[in-house]
Amino acid sequence: MDVSALSETTFSPAEWINANYKKFVEENGRDDSEAASAFIRSYVAKLQLYIFNVNNAVEESSRQVVASMPRIAKESAALQADVHRLQEKMSAMRLEVAAVQSETGECMATLERLNTKSQKLQVAKESLQESDGWGNLLAELEDGFERNDLKGVCDKLIALQKSLHAQEQLPGHAERQTQVEDFKNRLEALASPSVVQCFAEGNTEQAQHFVQIFTSIQRLPQLQQYYRAVQKNFWQQQWKQTLELQGTESQPQQQQFLTLYYDQLLEHCQRQVKWCSNLFGENSPQPFLVIAELLPALQPTRDAHILQLLKTSNERLEMLALFAKVNHSFVLHLNSLLEQSHITLSEELHRLLGEAIFEYFHKFIQQYPRLEETQLSTQVDRLSSNQATPSDGVRHLEESTRKLYEWLKEACERCASITSDLALCKLITLLNGIFKRQLESFGRIQRQIGLSLGSSSYAAQSENWSLLQYTMSQLQCLADFQVQLHQFEQDLHTRMVMLSNRLTKPSNRGPITIFQTCDHAARTQLLNSIADYQQKKSEATDSLGIFPQIYATLKSHFADTHDITLNILLQPIETHLAHIRPPVQDHAASGIEMPSFSFAPQESITQIGQYLLTLPQHLEPLLLSPSSLLKQALEVCNIKYTQAIPCADVLLSLVVEQCCVLYVTQILQIKSLPSSAATQLSVDIEYLSNVLEELGLSINLQLSQILTLLKAAPDQYLTLSSGCEPRLVTAIRQMRNIISTQ
């Protein structure tokens, strides 16, 4: 029997019996009731026997457990007693250990005091012994100095230093220390001529010998100072020779003095880096410290000599750009040398070296804006010339705008090359004046066109399309100026962002740059100016915040030029309207009677209509497919040009709108209007309305209301005038002499 299934958690008696029965049938080949009964009897008997055995096993296990319980309880009690005894022993041992520690601690303290006293006694003994030999050492030192025995003096001085250290606890230590320092000074004075000579000759063997001597007497910094003094004296002489040599050359050659000197200095520095590494140890910064101390102390100073050259030069900006380039080239090679030699400069030396190279040039950076303004003003003044005709003036504006922005780009390039953009904000300030001077030229041409419009030569012509072409060209030129100004502003913002990043970069890391030499006040002022321009950029709508006044002036020029355009187109209309203008005074006062009009449109009105009908054919060549610049200019002048309709149609609508306004003004000047005159006037207005309908336009609301009021019968005037402007209702009623019934 497989009784293992009985212990499973999912045991099913029926399934278990059926499975065993199937196995029985397969083994015996019988499947009848008798076989089933026999199988069941056999399995029941086996199960009963199995259960009986299990019960016996359980009873036997229970009996054994009950029998062993007293023994387990006895053993547990014994174990508990043993644990209690162990705890008592551990407590007693802890007390014994504490007592031993207390006793040995006092003994150790006593031993330490004895050891300290022993050491002090030993030091005192040695001090007394050294004190006895101190006088002998002093005498031997004096003897060595008399014989100029440098090596002997050095050895005795080393021994004297050891003796001084040994006598540190004895009285009179300060006096002995002073004596040692005096001997060191005398030794340094004794060695100084030889030190200077060996450094001047570059004698490595002797220099190493002196390094050992000065290191032994703790005077290595003084030896390094001798090294720097020799180097600086040599290069000061080289500086004077360079200036004298260049002074005999031509002016272009004289400007190369700084390049020549820096090249020699770099070549020498490269050799000295290796020499000092062998002499003073790896990564010795002494050659770079020489440069940091040498350049500010040069006589005559670099800035004084450059100023002298600037006074005799007519190309000052080019000369400053040359010297700025020399500075940057020198520092570039110096940074490369630092990187190749793996020398890390201290923060202080890093700062001093940058100031030594660039600080003298900051006064020229401050002078740069004034020099740049002078040059730009001179260039712009050459452009400012009065032109004989408007056509010449407009062509001159196109050329001058192109040249102006070329000069401005060159000025920005000079600002970057000379000042590394440190004077960029000051350059922006002076550029406002340059732009204003250029915009004055636009104003002059506008006035010239306006005067040409009113002159007798042009007044005789009813249609002057040449002036219209000039105004369109000027609008296009203004738009070109605005587009280039916007791009120029964008370039300036990009440069200011780059400048801000360079100024905020930590100055004690990375290569040496001119930006680390800006003093705190100038740096703060520059960053504040850049932040102010960025703030204005975010707040501005028409510009990028750098030249808002220039944009405002430009907008005014756009409007003025567009007004001139309208005036050109309206001049024939005004001329025709002037011919039909009724008298201002009353007929009774003047004694003049109005003529008896026919009911056909007057000639002046028909001439206005014919002129308006011919306008599209004149405007379309100019505005049918305007350039992007002209389209932009027109959109600035009037928002209607932004609509998805041809610019010619927009301009025509503006002319018609102004024509209606002028016509209304003429009508409102009439004092009295008989019925026949009112009928004639209404016929004229209807004719004008029909003409405008052919153009796809209409008369304005005021003229339409006047037409309604003119056609209204006196008895229906009040009713038909409902919805019209009260001002027009009153004016027309008075003209027609209609008695108010209100």
Curated annotation (Swiss-Prot):
Protein encoded by which gene: Cog7
Any one of the GO BP annotations: actomyosin contractile ring contraction
Record text on subunit structure and interactions: Component of the conserved oligomeric Golgi complex which is composed of eight different subunits and is required for normal Golgi morphology and localization.
Protein name: Conserved oligomeric Golgi complex subunit 7
SS bonds (residue pairs): none
Topology in the lipid bilayer: Peripheral membrane protein
Family note: Belongs to the COG7 family.
UniProt GO cellular component terms: acroblast; Golgi apparatus; Golgi membrane; Golgi transport complex
Keyword list, A-Z: Golgi apparatus, Membrane, Protein transport, Transport
A Pfam family matched in the record: COG7
Source species of the chain: Drosophila melanogaster (Fruit fly)
Claim: Heme is one of the keywords in the record: no
Subcellular location: Golgi apparatus membrane
Keyword flag Membrane: yes
Function noted in UniProt: Required for normal Golgi function.
